[in-house]
């Protein structure tokens, strides 16, 4: 069995991190396992409870609470917190499994995520300039929130990523005899391949992972050029939601997979040995 190979194809960082990896010598099932682990098994911190003491704005309490619950919260070391179900307090609420914040504003003004005042120095909104609502003249909002660690398996708001996807690595299949016979001329809009009078004059192999012209190649070259998606190599795209770094999210997803496999291994050994 050949070892799995991974290389970073593209990385960009602005408000969030985006990366594309090429994963080879693997299967769609394994790559999909990583995708699902990123969505469901990586803990993040999110607002779970909202206690509204005063809200004079036209926005319903339920809508206000819903907006607060979807704000990504950034904490560099999520390991300092425990999932409520696993905490020593039994989920009743303590400094290990929850963080509190207060919000108190008077109008007229706009309310942003940065207006939440957390009682933990390491916790802050991933995007402080996120607009929550507007408070008009003689209006007031006073509330308290409780944020807890959770998994995307429980609710989508706890996902550390906004998008994860994969596809088979594109590979060109070229019938050179057919190209010459029909004297085909074609240039890919993405600049990946150029054919002049039946001759392939340019192929940008490095940009093949970006290829999106599967049907056009076949149509414009009368089937002489086709794109095949490999089933043992994949283009893996991931984008964070700002709540943690990309490398942290990926490593924690892999740790979660490893933990489940170790648990499965121990239980199978126990069953087989009859202990």
From Swiss-Prot:
Gene3D superfamilies, sorted: 3.30.70.20, DNA-directed RNA polymerase, insert domain (2.170.120.12), RNA polymerase, RBP11-like subunit (3.30.1360.10)
KW Nucleotide-binding (keyword) present: no
Cellular localisation: Cytoplasm
Annotated Gene Ontology cellular component terms: cytoplasm; DNA-directed RNA polymerase complex
Record flagged with keyword Cytoplasm: yes
One Gene Ontology biological process: DNA-templated transcription
Domain of life: Archaea
InterPro entries named among the record's database cross-references: DNA-dir_RNA_pol_30-40kDasu_CS, DNA-dir_RNA_pol_insert, DNA-dir_RNA_pol_RpoA/D/Rpb3, RBP11-like, RNAP_Rpo3/Rpb3/RPAC1, RNApol_insert_sf, Rpo3/RPB3_RNA_Pol_subunit
A GO molecular-function annotation: DNA binding
Positions of transmembrane segments: none
Principal subcellular localisation of the protein: cytoplasm
Its EC number(s): 2.7.7.6
Stretch forming the signal peptide: none
Keywords: Cytoplasm, DNA-directed RNA polymerase, Nucleotidyltransferase, Transcription, Transferase
Catalytic activity: RNA(n) + a ribonucleoside 5'-triphosphate = RNA(n+1) + diphosphate
Family: Belongs to the archaeal Rpo3/eukaryotic RPB3 RNA polymerase subunit family.
Described function: DNA-dependent RNA polymerase (RNAP) catalyzes the transcription of DNA into RNA using the four ribonucleoside triphosphates as substrates.
Subunit structure: Part of the RNA polymerase complex.
Protein's recorded name: DNA-directed RNA polymerase subunit Rpo3
Organism whose genome encodes this protein: Methanopyrus kandleri (strain AV19 / DSM 6324 / JCM 9639 / NBRC 100938)
Lineage of source species: Archaea, Methanobacteriati, Methanobacteriota, Methanomada group, Methanopyri
């Amino acid at each position: 069995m050949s070892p799995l190979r991974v290389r970073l194809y593209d990385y960009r960082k602005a408000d969030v991190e985006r990366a594309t990896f090429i994963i080879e010598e693997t299967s769609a099932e394994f790559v999909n396992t990583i995708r699902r682990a990123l969505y469901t098994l990586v803990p993040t911190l999110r607002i779970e409870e909202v206690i509204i003491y005063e809200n004079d704005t036209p926005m319903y309490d339920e809508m206000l609470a819903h907006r607060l619950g979807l704000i990504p919260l950034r904490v560099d070391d999520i390991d300092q917190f425990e999932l409520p179900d696993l905490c020593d307090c039994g989920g009743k609420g303590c400094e290990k499994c929850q963080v509190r914040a207060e919000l108190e504003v008077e109008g007229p003004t706009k309310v942003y995520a940065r207006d939440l005042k957390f009682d933990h120095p390491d916790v802050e909104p991933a995007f402080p300039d996120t607009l929550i609502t507007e408070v008009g003249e003689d209006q007031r909002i006073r509330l308290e929130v409780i944020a807890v660690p959770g998994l995307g398996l429980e609710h989508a708001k706890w996902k550390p990523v906004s998008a994860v996807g994969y596809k088979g690595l594109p590979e060109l299949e070229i019938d050179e005899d057919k190209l010459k016979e029909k004297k085909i001329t074609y240039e890919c809009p993405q600049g990946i391949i150029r054919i002049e009078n039946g001759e392939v004059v340019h192929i940008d192999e490095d940009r093949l992972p970006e290829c999106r012209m599967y049907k056009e190649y076949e149509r414009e070259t009368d089937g002489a050029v086709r794109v095949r998606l490999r089933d043992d190599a994949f283009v893996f795209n991931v984008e964070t939601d700002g709540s943690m770094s990309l490398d942290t999210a990926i490593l924690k997803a892999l740790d979660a997979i490893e933990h489940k496999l170790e648990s499965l291994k121990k239980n199978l050994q126990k069953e087989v040995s009859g202990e």
